Every structure is written in structure tokens, then in C-alpha cells.
């Protein structure tokens, strides 16, 4: 049982009534929800009963008049009941919203009151820890300290009663502060068993809570910081009766792990994951993220910024920020957003050690205690170094400042039962292809490598060299194809792949499970092809993996009896918030510049729950840049420890130009000295043994480096990374001489003034060994995309035929020169002249100048304007003429099914064309309506029927329809601006305050009314024409009289003219 102080019991009694009220309100809301559902069902059944019977009644059936009257009365009665129920339902909905708002207001008021109370003893607690806080606390004097000055003993003007009251308060504070809660057992609502150091961490968090202090939980990765945090919230729930609300803000990749851990360890706490598309977030806001319905809100950094308006409605008990190093910059958008939320406590969680950077430390302290650490200038002045002797004192002061807020423990110190971790560096040579690319990269930027380039260019060379060390297929065009095939060439062309191919079968035989980390996502693609080729089952996570897919992969790998052997992870995306303790081998295919990132990757397996010894194999290409990258990472780890122990305030964060130059030059002599592969055929056990020896040598070297660094004095001009004697010897190597000796000059064109026939025949007829036949130049098939509409199938056939012929012809020549064969095998036929011409025509038919960007722009333009509006589509295309776009559109119309995802593309285009068609229909309907009026701005009338609203008047609707006809449907911003600038609505606040969405909804309502009116008008016109036609056919035609028949045509014509003139005169009058 937990031993709590009396103060804890009294606090429970103090808030019990308030908590009961909140629970009762919540129960009432839930009862109202059930009642609303029942009412909705009953109202729906009433409406079904009230609905008129649509079955036809026969003429023979006789319905009594009395029965009709009774049925009418029943219908009226049911309609009245339904109407009352609907009104009651509406009233209950209103009451429900009011109750929820009351709960939220009560909750926020309670949290705000606690916020005001917790600050009273905070400074006093901090001053008890160290006197340093007095310096910062003095900068913000309390009101009692701001009283006017006087002289003598009457200067304070403090009465005897006031002095007694202050003394009583101090005594009470001393009594209350003397006790403190210390749990001896974990909260009962926590499932599972807390380890001793985790229980100690929980007690540390409770002590911070009781003293009103925010803190940083910075235990090493894998020690269960998530569980300790959940245990704190469980303690508040069980012992303090505080159910929240709390908010956890974490990287998007860790949200699934947070939700799983809360459900697993403390299922009594109701957690809501606030993430998703706008529709999903709207549902969460309205149904789940409601006061009284949740305890913990788990969301990502991006959602906290995007939905800050929603989250600011709540006052939070605890805001917990995972991976808190993201807010070390106080000017970042995330840091500014997190400071906007109202909260009682803030808890930061980080697994990376805090560097002694003064400004970053101040940013964290300012976030934790803004009223104390309010000024960065004051902080910097207080810890300013005036000399070398003050260095140690300043570091001690920094540690004193951090002590009340920070808890950091290492696995080696607290987790004695955790199996050890063993790291081995496995070195491997380079293949012939790797050496070829490595040499070409150095020769390409010879000026930069000689020391004349900028740091940025050196970084680019270093990145390219590291790609070459990983696999040459990372360079475009290195892999043979298309068609691209999986085979032994994936392994033999890279030294690390040869090493991996030897290592994995050994690990498979001993029932180990493997995590493979790499920084390069494209390398994971190559590893994925390799695993499929060898038949190993695997999972994969990189930066493009979605949250649901990520959780499913982790679950599939960790489930009991899983057959997944390998897990491929990118170092950056897969190194955070993932528990893969079911694996016992970690392979670092390449090393990160920052060693902390590699440690995070290793801790995915070396964490609580691991039952086997964890083996870490770090691959390294010997005599290349990677050896220096790994050595620098080891030195940086040693320096990080030195920062904490010795207090180095100015640590080196980025590699400088000289270091980069040494790394790039390292091993160049070995690379240029030989073209052959340096991959050995040694057994994997022998390779591991040599790796252990190399790792032990490096550890001894780092130990000496640390001892030298401890004795080294602080000097701004010195470099921490200059403790390696090899670097000094290497700087003496003439790199330019090495490259020049192995440089292959390109052939030069020579022009000779005199031509000698004798010399020509001498050289021609000179006897000697026959020259070795050169390998044929294999034609390379250009990269063809589906949207370029080439005839890929036929082109592939022609290229394969040409390549096959050239290779067979070359092999035949080699066999003829080396082996005497009577009748060599027949060689396939080369391309005929017709096939060569066909190939050239096929290459011209496609759209080789169209890129993926052009294609996407074409699709978007088709969605916007429709496929037939070529002129508008061409206006959206950069660098394409209207003729080119028209030609592409014609081919697209016929061959769009050749695209990989043509169904999705066509659906998007058809959806856009439907919007255009609907827009045209709307504009025609409005035009038809306005054509019936001489001045529609004044005369336009809309037939509302019985559905006329009370918010918008007829003048507003008339103006809206006329402006839409003028501006076009969909231009809602322009419509809103027209309402605001029109003098008609100068004093109409309602109309001027409408949003574009509200105006669009009103306009759609009016358009439906106009379309209905147009249909009725067309129907009346059609009926009138039909009746006129029928009346004409029913009236007999009049025959001319005899006198008219006898008159001549000329006289009749004169009479008609006279009548028309008379009629015109009458009309003029």
C-alpha cells in the first residue's frame, strides 16, 4: 500500500464534491444521449406511420365516409405527436450542448484555480534546492516587495495583526511542506509490474507535481519513459481523483505506440487519437473530443499546430511533449504554439542527452518556468565565462539549475537485468565496379579534393562517395537494364552485400531476428529486392510509410511465432518510438554523421523486454571515407560524455572543411593503386573475429583520446578532432601526385602537316601480337515512361535483339582467338535496315520531351478546363505550344489505358468535367431567369414557396443572383467583396459578416429554386404551345368571298399596303 501524507487525504476531501458534480454531469449527458437516440427512433417510427398510403384504390372498393374522417383525425393526431417529439428532441439537443459547455467551463475553472494555487510554493521549493534561483526570482519582485520606502522601524508600516498573520502562514507552509507523497507500490490501475527505477521515477514526477514544478524526463532510450508518464497520470486518477484532461504531443510515428501503451498499462484512462483528414478530425471534434468524454488527447506536432483553435478551448492538467528536443528553438512555430495552450503542468520527454548550449538550455527552462527564466540576456550574463578558471564553476552552476527539473538515468546504471549489448565493426573491401565509380568521383572534382573547393562541394563529394560504398546501383545507369532483374549481380557488385549475404544465413541458423538500418531509402529498395531473391520474409518502414501500415508492420513482426526474419528501417524514420525487442541483431548498413541517431536505432532492440544479448554489426568499407565517418562518430560520443563530465560549453556540432577534406582523401592511394576487387573469400566467423579485434583497437584509441582531451585546456583555436596521429601522417601524402599518376588522359585530336606513305605502311605491316578485341558498345535503351506513349513492347524486342547479337558476336570472336573451334555456333541475325528504321520511327513517335511534371500539369489542366478546351490547357503548360498539347491530347484520348493508374486519372478528369458541366448548367439557368426581366437588379423575384428563410431578405437574394451571373459561379471571394463594398448593405451587419461558405450555401439554395421555377415555366410554355396548336387544327379555314375572288392580284396588293399604312398611323398616334 502507498504511504500518503495527511495533506494528501485532505486534498482528496477538498475536491471530492467538485469531482462528484462533474461525474454526475457526465452521467446526465450520457443519459441524455440514450434518451435522444430513443426519441429519434420513436420519431422515425411515427413518421413512417404518418406517411400516406400510396397503394392505388380500386373503383369497386367502397370507403365509408366515417372511416375517412377517423383516419384523418388519427393522421392529424400522429402528425401533432411527431411535431412535438421533434421539438422536444431539438430542445434536448440544445440542453445537451449547454450541459457539455457547463462541464467544460467548470473543468477549465477548476484547472485555472489549481494553476493559481500551484505557483505559491514553487519559488520557495526552488530556493530550497539551490540559491541560484534567488538571482532570477529577484528580477520579478512580489507586490509586498514593491511597497514604498521609509525610514526607521516604521518604514514597512506593517501592523501587529498583519505580522502575526504572516507568521502563521509561514508556519503552516512549513508544516505542509514537511510531508510528501512517496509510493512504495505502484497504482492499482496500472497493469503489469513497474521496475524499481521506474517506481523511483514515478515518485520523482509526483514530487514535481506536489511542488508545482514542470520537469524533463530524460532517461536513456529503452528505460520505459512512456510507462512512467502513464503511471503519473494513473496516480492522479487513483489517488487525486484527477481524470484530466491531459494532452500528449508526439511525433506522428509514435502516436500508435502511445495509444497501445495506454490501453495496455492503464485501460481505465480514456484516450483519443486526434489525427486524420479534415472529415475524420471533424468527427473527432464533435463526438469524441468533448468535455467529460475523454481523459487523454494524443496528437502529433502537426495537428497541434493545425488544430490549435480546437485545443485551446480546453484548459489542460498536463501537456506532455515527447521528443522534446523539437522545441529547443523558442522561435519555431511548434514552440510558439505549445506556449499558447493553458495548462497546469508541462512535462518534456527526451531520450537524447542535453548539450550544454546556453541558449538551448534557456529555451527549455523558459518553457518550463517562464515566470522565472523570462530573459535570455539575464541568463547569458549570469553564466558568462570571464576566464578559463571559471569554466568548472559555470558548469557546476548549470547542473545546479537543471537538478530540480531533470532526471536522466542510463541503462548501465539502473537496468542490471537487461542483457548486454555488443557492437562489432565489420570491415569489407570494394568490388571492381565500386572502385571504378569511387575513382571516377575523385577524378571528377580534382580541384575540390586538392583543397580549393567550398565546404558545400566537399559535402556533396562525401555523400557521393558514401553512396558508392553502399552500392553502385544507387547511381543512375549503373544497374544493367531494362529489363531490370534480380540475381547474383545485386550481391557481387557491392562489398557490403557480399558481407550481408554471408552473415544472414548464419543468423538464420541460430534463430536470430534482424533489424537492418540505412539512411538511404533507395538502398532499402535494393535490400528489398535482395531479400525477395533469397526468399527471406521481411517488413519495411521508411519515411513514406503511413501510420496504419507502420503499426501493422510492427505488430506482424512482434507477434508470437512470427515468420518475419528481417525488418528494414530507415535510420531517421524508424529510429524513434518503435519497440522491436523481439529482434536480437541490429545491422547498421551505413553510419550516420550524428552518433545519437545510430544509438536510437540500436535501442529499438536493446530495451526493456529483451531476453537475448543484442549484437550490433556496423558495416564499414575499409580504406574509404566510411572508416573516418565511424571514427568521428566514436569521437563525438566520447566528447558528449566529456561535455557532461568536464563541462565543455562550446562543442563542435558540424564537420568542418578540413575534416571533410581528410575524410575524402582517406584511402585514395589504395583505391588508385589497384583496379581489382578487394573483397575477400574469408569465412564469416573469421570476418567477425577480425571485426572484434578492430573494434577493440578503436575502443582503446578512444580511451586514449578521452584521457588526452581531459588534460587538454580550453582553447578556441584548437580542434577536438585532432587527436589522431594517422591524420597527421595522412596530411603529408601528396594527393595530387597519386591522382596524376593514375590519371587516364582522354584521347587528343592531332593534325599532322606531312603525311608519309612509307611510315604508314611500316606501322600497318609491323609484326606483333594481335590486339585484344575491344568489347562492343552495348546500345542503351532510353528510359521510357508510360505517359510518354512509346511502343515499349516493340522497342524492347528490337533492343534485346540488337544486344543479343552484339554479345554473341563478341563471344564468338573471343572463342575464335583463344580456342580452335572447327565450326562455331551460328550467331543471331543483326537488325535489318527496316528494323533500324522502325526503331528510329518508334523513338520519334513518343513524347520524349514530356516529363512527369508536364504530364501532371496536363492532367490538372484537364480537370480544371475539360479535355476539349485545348487552348486553356495549353495556357497552363509551361514550355509547350498549343500544337504540341493538341497532339498529346489526341494520343491521350486513344491510349490513356496504357497508363499504370489510368482509372484514377480518368475518374479525376471526369469529376472535374462534371463540375464544369454543372457550372455551365447553373449559369444557363440564371441567365434564363434574368432574361425574363427588363431590369433584374430591381425587378427580379424568386418563388420561395413556403421555404423562405428568415435570415436573408429578398433584396439580398436578388443582389446575390445578379452578381453570380456577372462574376460567374464559384467566385465566392469576389461575391463576398461585392457585398462588403455595395452601398445597399452598408448597415447590414448580418450580410457583411457572412463567410464564403455560407454565401455559397445560400446561392446553391437559390439556384435550386430557380431551376425548379424554370422547369415549371418551360412546362407552361410547352402546354401553351400544345393548346395553341390544337385550337388552330380545330378552327375551320375561311374561304374568300366571290368579290375578292374576282379582284385582280394588283388591286389586292394595293389594299394590303393601304391597310398596313393605316395601321401604322394608328399605332403612331
Swiss-Prot record:
Its EC number is 3.6.4.-. CDD domains: DEXHc_SMARCA1_SMARCA5 (cd17997), SANT (cd00167), SF2_C_SNF (cd18793). Residues 1-10, 79-93, 1059-1069 have a biased composition (Basic and acidic residues). Belongs to the SNF2/RAD54 helicase family. ISWI subfamily. This is ISWI chromatin-remodeling complex ATPase CHR17. The keyword Transcription regulation does not apply. It is found in: Nucleus. SUPFAM superfamilies: HAND domain of the nucleosome remodeling ATPase ISWI, Homeodomain-like, P-loop containing nucleoside triphosphate hydrolases. The gene is CHR17. InterPro entries: Helicase_ATP-bd (IPR014001), Helicase_C-like (IPR001650), Homeodomain-like_sf (IPR009057), Isw1/2_DEXHc (IPR044754), ISWI_HAND-dom (IPR015194), ISWI_HAND-dom_sf (IPR036306), P-loop_NTPase (IPR027417), SANT/Myb (IPR001005).
Amino acid at each position: 500500500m502507498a504511504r500518503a501524507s495527511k495533506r494528501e487525504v485532505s486534498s482528496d476531501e477538498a475536491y471530492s464534491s467538485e469531482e462528484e458534480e462533474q461525474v454526475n454531469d457526465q452521467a446526465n449527458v450520457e443519459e441524455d444521449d440514450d434518451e435522444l437516440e430513443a426519441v429519434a427512433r420513436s420519431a422515425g417510427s411515427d413518421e413512417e406511420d404518418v406517411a400516406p398510403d400510396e397503394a392505388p384504390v380500386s373503383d369497386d372498393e367502397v370507403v365509408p365516409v366515417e372511416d375517412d374522417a377517423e383516419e384523418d383525425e388519427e393522421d392529424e393526431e400522429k402528425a401533432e405527436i411527431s411535431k412535438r417529439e421533434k421539438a422536444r428532441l431539438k430542445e434536448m439537443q440544445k440542453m445537451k450542448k449547454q450541459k457539455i459547455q457547463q462541464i467544460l467551463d467548470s473543468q477549465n475553472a477548476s484547472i485555472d484555480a489549481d494553476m493559481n494555487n500551484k505557483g505559491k510554493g514553487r519559488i520557495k521549493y526552488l530556493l530550497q534546492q539551490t540559491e541560484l534561483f534567488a538571482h532570477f526570482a529577484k528580477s520579478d519582485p512580489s507586490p509586498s516587495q514593491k511597497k514604498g520606502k521609509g525610514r526607521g522601524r516604521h518604514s514597512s508600516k506593517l501592523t501587529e495583526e498583519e505580522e502575526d498573520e504572516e507568521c502563521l502562514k509561514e508556519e503552516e507552509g512549513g508544516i505542509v511542506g514537511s510531508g510528501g507523497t512517496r509510493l512504495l507500490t505502484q497504482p492499482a490501475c496500472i497493469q503489469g509490474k513497474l521496475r524499481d527505477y521506474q517506481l523511483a521515477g514515478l515518485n520523482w514526477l509526483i514530487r514535481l507535481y506536489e511542488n508545482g514544478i514542470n520537469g524533463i524526463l530524460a532517461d536513456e532510450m529503452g528505460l520505459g519513459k512512456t510507462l512512467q508518464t502513464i503511471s503519473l497520470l494513473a496516480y492522479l486518477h487513483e489517488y487525486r481523483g484527477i481524470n484530466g484532461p491531459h494532452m500528449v504531443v508526439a511525433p506522428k510515428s509514435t502516436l500508435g505506440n502511445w495509444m497501445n501503451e495506454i490501453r495496455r498499462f492503464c485501460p481505465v484512462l480514456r484516450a483519443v487519437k486526434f489525427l486524420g483528414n479534415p472529415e475524420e478530425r471533424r468527427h473527432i471534434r464533435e463526438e469524441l473530443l468533448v468535455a467529460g468524454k475523454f481523459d487523454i488527447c494524443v496528437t502529433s506536432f502537426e495537428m497541434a499546430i493545425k488544430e490549435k483553435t480546437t485545443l485551446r478551448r480546453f484548459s489542460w492538467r498536463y501537456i506532455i511533449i515527447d521528443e522534446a528536443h523539437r522545441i529547443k528553438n523558442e522561435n519555431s512555430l511548434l514552440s510558439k504554439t505549445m506556449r499558447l495552450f493553458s495548462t497546469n503542468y508541462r512535462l518534456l520527454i527526451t531520450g537524447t542527452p542535453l548539450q550544454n548550449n546556453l541558449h538551448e538550455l534557456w529555451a527549455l527552462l523558459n518553457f518550463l518556468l517562464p515566470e522565472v527564466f523570462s530573459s535570455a540576456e539575464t541568463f547569458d550574463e549570469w553564466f558568462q565565462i570571464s576566464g578559463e578558471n571559471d569554466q568548472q564553476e559555470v558548469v557546476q552552476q548549470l547542473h545546479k539549475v537543471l537538478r530540480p527539473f531533470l532526471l536522466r538515468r542510463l541503462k548501465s546504471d539502473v537496468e542490471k537485468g537487461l542483457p548486454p549489448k555488443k557492437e562489432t565493426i565489420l570491415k569489407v573491401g570494394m568490388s571492381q565496379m565500386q572502385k571504378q565509380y569511387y575513382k571516377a568521383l575523385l577524378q571528377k572534382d580534382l580541384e575540390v579534393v586538392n583543397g580549393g573547393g567550398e565546404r558545400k562541394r566537399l559535402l556533396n563529394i562525401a555523400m557521393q562517395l558514401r553512396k558508392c560504398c553502399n552500392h553502385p546501383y544507387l547511381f543512375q545507369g549503373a544497374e544493367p537494364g531494362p529489363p531490370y532483374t534480380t540475381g547474383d549481380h545485386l550481391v557481387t557488385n557491392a562489398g557490403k552485400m557480399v558481407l550481408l549475404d554471408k552473415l544472414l544465413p548464419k543468423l538464420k541458423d541460430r534463430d536470430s531476428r534482424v533489424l537492418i538500418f540505412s539512411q538511404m531509402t533507395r538502398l532499402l529498395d535494393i535490400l528489398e529486392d535482395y531479400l525477395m531473391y533469397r526468399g527471406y520474409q521481411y517488413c519495411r518502414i521508411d519515411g513514406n510509410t503511413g501510420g496504419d501500415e507502420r503499426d501493422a508492420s510492427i505488430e506482424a513482426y512482434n507477434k508470437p511465432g512470427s515468420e518475419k526474419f528481417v525488418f528494414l528501417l530507415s535510420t531517421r524514420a524508424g529510429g524513434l518510438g518503435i519497440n522491436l525487442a523481439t529482434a536480437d541483431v541490429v545491422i547498421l548498413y551505413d553510419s550516420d554523421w550524428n552518433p545519437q541517431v545510430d544509438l536510437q536505432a540500436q535501442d529499438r532492440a536493446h530495451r526493456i523486454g529483451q531476453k537475448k544479448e543484442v549484437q550490433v554489426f556496423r558495416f564499414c568499407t575499409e580504406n574509404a571515407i566510411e572508416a573516418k565517418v565511424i571514427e568521428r562518430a566514436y569521437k563525438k560520443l566520447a566528447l558528449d560524455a566529456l561535455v557532461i563530465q568536464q563541462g565543455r560549453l562550446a562543442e563542435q556540432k558540424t564537420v568542418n572543411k578540413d575534416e571533410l577534406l581528410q575524410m575524402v582523401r582517406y584511402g585514395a592511394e589504395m583505391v588508385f593503386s589497384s583496379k581489382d576487387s578487394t573483397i575477400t573469400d574469408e569465412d564469416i566467423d573469421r570476418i567477425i573475429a577480425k571485426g572484434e579485434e578492430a573494434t577493440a583497437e578503436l575502443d582503446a584509441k578512444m580511451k586514449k583520446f578521452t584521457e588526452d582531451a581531459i588534460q587538454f585546456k580550453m582553447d578556441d583555436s584548437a580542434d577536438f578532432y585532432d587527436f589522431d596521429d594517422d591524420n597527421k601522417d595522412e596530411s603529408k601524402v601528396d594527393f595530387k601526385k597519386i591522382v596524376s599518376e593514375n590519371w587516364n588522359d582522354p584521347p587528343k585530336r592531332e593534325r599532322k602537316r606531312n603525311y608519309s606513305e612509307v611510315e604508314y605502311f611500316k606501322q600497318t605491316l609491323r609484326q606483333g601480337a594481335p590486339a585484344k578485341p575491344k568489347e562492343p558498345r552495348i546500345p542503351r535503351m532510353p528510359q521510357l515512361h508510360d505517359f510518354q506513349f512509346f511502343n515499349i513492347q516493340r522497342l524492347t524486342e528490337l533492343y534485346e535483339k540488337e544486344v543479343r547479337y552484339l554479345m554473341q558476336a563478341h563471344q564468338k570472336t573471343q572463342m575464335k582467338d583463344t580456342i580452335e573451334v572447327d565450326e562455331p555456333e551460328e550467331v543471331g541475325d543483326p537488325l535489318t535496315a527496316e528494323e533500324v528504321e522502325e526503331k528510329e520511327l518508334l523513338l520519334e513517335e513518343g513524347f520524349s520531351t514530356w516529363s512527369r511534371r508536364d504530364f501532371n500539369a496536363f492532367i490538372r489542366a484537364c480537370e480544371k478546363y475539360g479535355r476539349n478546351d485545348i487552348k486553356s490547357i495549353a495556357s497552363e503548360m509551361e514550355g509547350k505550344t498549343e500544337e504540341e498539347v493538341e497532339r498529346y491530347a489526341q494520343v491521350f484520348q486513344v491510349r490513356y489505358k496504357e497508363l499504370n493508374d489510368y482509372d484514377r486519372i480518368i475518374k479525376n478528369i471526369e469529376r472535374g468535367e462534371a463540375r464544369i458541366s454543372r457550372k455551365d448548367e447553373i449559369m444557363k439557368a440564371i441567365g434564363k431567369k434574368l432574361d425574363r426581366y427588363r431590369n433584374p437588379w430591381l425587378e427580379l423575384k424568386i418563388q420561395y414557396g413556403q421555404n423562405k428563410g428568415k435570415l436573408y431578405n429578398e433584396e439580398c437574394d436578388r443582389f446575390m443572383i445578379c452578381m453570380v451571373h456577372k462574376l460567374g459561379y464559384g467566385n465566392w471571394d469576389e461575391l463576398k467583396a461585392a457585398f462588403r463594398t455595395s452601398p445597399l448593405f452598408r448597415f447590414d451587419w448580418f450580410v457583411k459578416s457572412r463567410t464564403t461558405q455560407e454565401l455559397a450555401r445560400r446561392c446553391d439554395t437559390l439556384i435550386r429554386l430557380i431551376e425548379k421555377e424554370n422547369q415549371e415555366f418551360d412546362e407552361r410554355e410547352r402546354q401553351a404551345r400544345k393548346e395553341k396548336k390544337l385550337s388552330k387544327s380545330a378552327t375551320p379555314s375561311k374561304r374568300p368571298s366571290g368579290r375578292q375572288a374576282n379582284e385582280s392580284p394588283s388591286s389586292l396588293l394595293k389594299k394590303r399596303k393601304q391597310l398596313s399604312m393605316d395601321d401604322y398611323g394608328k399605332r403612331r398616334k
